[in-house]
C-alpha cells in the first residue's frame, strides 16, 4: 500500500516536469500550517506525521521536503541554523515577547539543494497567512534562487550560497559531512547526523528551560491561530483585525 508521502508526491507532481514538480512540492509543504505541537518522534516517520496531522514545525516539514526532492533525484542536505526566538521583526504580543526573551538558543531546520555549482537554501517553514505578523514567508520561489531563511541566524543574517565552482571541492568536504558555513549553520548529509547533532545541542537544557519552552510552544501556537484568523494580538483583550 502506498504511504501518505507517496500518495502526496504523486498528487503534487502528476503530469509535471522536474522543475515544476519541485516548485509544487515546495509550495504545498510551505502551505502546511506551522505548529510546534506536533512532536518530532523520529526523523524517518516525521514526513508521514506532518501529512497525517496536517501541520508541523520546521523539522517535519523539511524532512518531508527532502524526501520528496530526492524522489526527483535532486541532491539535498539538511541545514541546522542556530537562532533566537526573540526576533524583533515578529509582532509578538507582550507576554509572548517576554517568554521569547527568556528562551535558550533554538535550532531551525531547513534544506540546501544543489543547483549547478551552488547549494541554495530552500526554506518552506512559514505558511503564507503568517506574513502579516512579520514572518518571512517565501511566497514566490522560482526553483533556482535562494529562499529567505525563516529565522535570523545568530551570527549572519543570511547564509550565502556556495556559488564559486573553484571552491566547491574545498567547501564540500565529504569526510566532515559539512559545507563551508557560518558559525550558526551546520550542514548534514542525512537525517541520522542531523538528529545526533540536534540532540547534542538541546540535551544541555535545564529543567527550567524545558518548562519555559513548553509554555512558549503552547502560547506561540495559540497566537499563530489568531494570526491566521486575522486577529493580531497586541495586548490583553486587544485584537487588530
State what each model feature region is.
Residues 1-56:
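Secondary-structure boundary elements
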Residues 25, 29, 69, 76-78, ...:
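Generic structural hydrophobic/aromatic packing signal, biased to beta-strands
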Residues 40-102:
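Active-site neighborhood of thiol-dependent amide/isopeptide-bond enzymes
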Residues 17, 34, 83-241:
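His-Asp-centered catalytic microenvironments across diverse enzyme cores
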Amino acid at each position: 500500500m502506498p504511504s501518505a508521502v507517496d500518495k502526496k508526491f504523486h498528487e503534487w507532481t502528476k503530469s509535471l516536469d522536474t522543475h515544476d514538480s519541485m516548485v509544487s512540492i515546495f509550495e504545498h509543504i510551505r502551505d502546511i500550517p506551522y505548529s510546534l505541537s506536533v512532536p518530532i518522534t523520529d526523523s524517518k516517520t516525521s514526513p508521514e506525521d506532518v501529512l497525517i496531522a496536517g501541520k508541523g514545525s520546521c523539522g517535519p516539514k523539511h524532512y518531508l521536503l527532502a524526501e520528496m526532492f530526492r524522489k526527483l533525484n535532486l541532491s539535498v542536505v539538511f541545514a541546522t541554523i542556530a537562532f533566537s526566538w526573540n526576533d524583533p521583526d515578529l509582532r509578538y504580543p507582550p507576554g509572548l515577547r517576554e517568554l521569547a526573551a527568556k528562551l535558550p538558543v533554538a535550532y531551525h531546520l531547513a534544506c540546501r539543494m544543489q543547483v549547478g555549482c551552488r547549494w541554495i537554501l530552500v526554506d518552506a517553514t512559514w505558511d503564507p497567512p503568517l506574513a502579516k505578523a512579520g514572518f518571512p514567508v517565501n511566497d514566490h520561489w522560482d526553483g533556482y534562487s535562494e529562499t529567505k531563511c525563516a529565522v535570523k541566524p545568530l551570527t549572519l543574517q543570511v547564509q550565502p550560497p556556495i556559488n564559486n565552482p573553484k571552491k566547491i571541492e574545498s567547501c564540500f568536504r565529504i569526510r566532515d559531512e559539512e559545507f563551508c558555513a557560518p558559525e550558526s549553520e551546520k550542514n548534514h548529509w542525512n537525517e541520522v547526523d542531523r538528529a545526533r547533532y540536534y540532540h547534542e545541542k538541546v540535551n544541555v537544557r535545564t529543567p527550567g528551560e524545558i518548562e519555559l519552552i513548553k509554555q512558549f510552544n503552547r502560547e506561540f501556537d495559540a497566537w499563530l491561530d489568531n494570526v491566521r484568523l486575522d486577529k493580531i494580538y497586541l495586548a490583553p483583550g486587544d485584537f487588530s483585525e
